[in-house]
Amino acid sequence: MSSEFLSELHWEDGFAIPVANQENKILEDQLAKLHKEKSNLQDQLRDYEDRINSMSSHLKNVNQEFLFTQSLYKARECEIESEEHFKAIAERELGRVKDEIQQLEKEMAIILERKNDKENAIFKATQKLDGLKCQMNWDQQALEAWLEESAHKDSDSLTLQKYSQQDNNKIRALTLKLEKLTMECNEKRKLLDNELTETLSAQLELDKAAQDFRKIHVERQELIQQWENTIEQMQRRDQEIDNCALALARIKQEAREKEGVVREKIKFLENEVGNNVEYERRISIAERKVSKCRMEYQRQEANRNQLKDELDTLKTTLNRTSSDLEALRKNISKVKKDILDETGRLQKLKHHNEIVKHKLKMITEKTISIEEKATNMEDMLKEEEKNLKEVEVQLNIVKGVLFKKVQELQSAITKEKALGSEIEGTRSSLKHLNQRLHKLDFETLKQQEIMYSQDFYIQQVERRMSRLKGEINSEEKQALEVKIVELRKTMEERKSTLSLLEEQIKKLHNDLYFIKKSNGKNKDEKESLMNKIGELHLFVDRSEKELNKAKAVKEDLMIEDNLLKLQVKRARELLYSKAEEVLSLEKRKQQLCTAMEERVEEIKVHKAMLTSQIRYVDQQRQTVSSEFHERLSKIDKLKNRYEILTVVMLPPEGEEEKTQSYYVIKAAQEKEELQREGDSLDAKISKAEKEIYALQNTLQVLSSCNNNYKQSFKKVTPSSDEYGIKIQLEEQKRSADEKYRCKQRQIRELQEDIQSMENTFEVIEHLANNAREKLSEKQTLSFQLRKETEEQKPKIQRVTKQCGRLRREIRILRQTNDETLEEQDIQLREIIQFHKDIDQMLVNAMENAEIHVIFQTYFQQNGLELPTAKGPSSRSSSQSSLSSIRSLEDSIPISPPTAKVIELRFPGPPARSDSSRSSSGSNSNIPKGKKLNK
């Protein structure tokens, strides 16, 4: 702080730093105390704020806990209300059951009373019958007297008939009333059974509802218990949070105290640093400090050398890894170049052969006639057709090589990635070491700066002392002399540059000649690059067309996939519906089984009841028949008794005999009574027989129903219609399963096809991206070449104008209009250079083994030697041959050179589609059969 303040005041280093007086020191102490109080108050304020925040959070937690307890209280109230409601329902149920028990007890008492009444009535009737029997047995005299009296009256018979008819009518009415009562009794019994079933079902429903209520009540209690557990956990968490808040406040307080201590220490440190600076400036013995600094410097230098050795070792490892990486990159680039050469060399050869053919046509235009051209064209067409097949074979070979190279490239890329990761690790370690080195260098520089500042300060003091003494420095004189010498040297350098510029002007005139040649080469390269760009455009168009086709195929596959998904969905829905039908049929079967079992049990019960009823009716019939036989025997006994009585009761002599009408009336009365009893018994027997017939009919109906029901559960025979329906359903199910499996297989195959198509699509996209990148690179390169050619055009025009002007001047000086020897020499050199370029192109093309074999066969057919790569010695031989050529030019007349034509056929890329053929034919007129003139 003091150094910055002094630098702002522009305080010189030689003067001492001003120190505060006693009053200012007191003010500084007061200011420090106030700052300390301020920091303490700020700490207290922060402590209070933390407490307020903790209390507000605690209040929030308390409010939340209060809400939870309120909700729990409400839940408990609801539970108590539900318990009271269940208690009231149970009390009502208990009262209802008690009322029903009382009603049943009352009904039982009424039934017992009726039973007692009926028993009393039966007992009274039996007593009456016994009394009647006694009267019939013991009151024979009264009856005979009454018969005697009634025999005299004719009207008694009429009254008897009338009473008998009335009795018959009463009997019929009573029988009808009895039948009606029995019908009503049966109906009431049925209603009673229905009511019993309804009450039982209602009771079951009530039991189920009560069970559901109990289950819900248990679940509610469990939920409340969970709620209480969560509240307890939240309370524990709140307690933990409160403890943590207290601990946090305590830690913050400790941190504030430590910060205060740190501030005091920092202030003390700053004061000490200021004092040290002041004391260091006041130190007079600078040599000790310099020696210390030098020792420190030596130590740091030793450390630096050690770190430098470590850095060198790491650099060697880095260089080794980088060399390995470069080797891998070279291999990768070589593989890429081989791939590009394999794909592009054919087009290059075509382009070079086209240029050669064009130039040879210009040279041999005068010699070759129209007929020879026609024959050559026919031969070219024939050979083109032959070479198309060879091209396809070679293209397949190239594709295989390309696939292998791509695999090698992928493996090399993986290796490159691994090496890249290793290099990044070494680089990170290098960065770390470099940072350490920089730190050490920075420290050494600091030490050196301190040393330099001390030396500079000493020099300044010495200079001031010398200036005060009035001495002149010899160094300034030496500086002026050095400046004079430097100015003389600059003058000599200017002269030498002038001579060099003159020599460079001469060289520029010579360079114009070479620029002309390089311009021609640049034109050729430009044409080749334009052809390559056109080929790349064609490749991009083809790849885009294939991409569009792949997209269309993918869309079709997606549509088919969606259709198959819809079919699968429909089949699944049909399957689910069939499964539901099967489940419903199985449920129906189970229900029928249970119903059948219940029905069988009911039939058994009903059958037992019917058997008991039949047994009871048989017993009644037997009793009636026994009573009938007893009555007949009684009638016989009565007849015998009557005969005995008639004999016994003959009147004594002198008394009147009872009339016959008396006995006839008595017999008629007895007969009528017996007839009534017999009619009543016949009615009972006929009624019992009718009931038996009705029961037999119902039994037959039940047996037929049971038989049908049993037959419905029998196995289906092959001759029945149901068996055919079953077979049809099984076949439909089997066909549906097969269709489902086929659809699943088709879906799996389509998914695999889609996956493969996606993979191929990704590969095509990758190739298209690579092609686009290459195209962009080629476009940038072509743009640069165009720019360079446009820049070279004005130079070429200037050079051609200058050459024409020089040619005219030379011809004017020699006073000739014909070509001079120098011009012919230049043309000859151009032709020789042209042949050399062709030979070099052929040599470069023959680096490929397959193309070398093709060249060798064609050159051997025409009796020519293959061109070889020439060394630098060929240039001197060509220069020596030029002088001999010049000497022969004057003696030998110039005749046009005879050109020997070699037809070369190279395999071209196969046509992918008609559109690509037409586009390639329209864009480039490059023939596939090449001619070379030698």
Swiss-Prot record:
Compositional bias (Low complexity) spans?
873-892, 912-925
Q: Which residues carry this modification: Phosphoserine?
A: S887, S895
Pfam (any one): CCDC39
Superkingdom, taxonomy of origin: Eukaryota
Tell me yes or no: is Transport among this UniProt entry's keywords: no
Instruction: List the residue ranges forming a coiled coil, or say none.
Output: 17-133, 164-512, 540-615, 664-826
**GO terms classed as biological process:** axonemal dynein complex assembly; brain development; central nervous system myelination; cerebral cortex development; cerebrospinal fluid circulation; cilium movement; cilium-dependent cell motility; determination of digestive tract left/right asymmetry
Chain segments carrying region Disordered:
866-934
Q: Where in the cell?
A: Cytoplasm, Cytoskeleton, Cilium axoneme
* Principal subcellular localization: cytoplasm
**InterPro entries tied to this protein:** CCDC39
User: What is one cellular component GO term in this UniProt entry?
Assistant: 9+2 motile cilium
UniProt keywords (A-Z) are:
Cell projection, Cilium, Coiled coil, Cytoplasm, Cytoskeleton, Phosphoprotein
The UniProt function text for this chain reads: Required for assembly of dynein regulatory complex (DRC) and inner dynein arm (IDA) complexes, which are responsible for ciliary beat regulation, thereby playing a central role in motility in cilia and flagella. Probably acts together with CCDC40 to form a molecular ruler that determines the 96 nanometer (nm) repeat length and arrangements of components in cilia and flagella. Not required for outer dynein arm complexes assembly.
**Which PANTHER family does its entry note?**
COILED-COIL DOMAIN-CONTAINING PROTEIN 39
What is stated as this protein's family in its record? Answer: Belongs to the CCDC39 family.
Protein name as it appears in the record:
Coiled-coil domain-containing protein 39
Q: Which gene encodes it?
A: Ccdc39
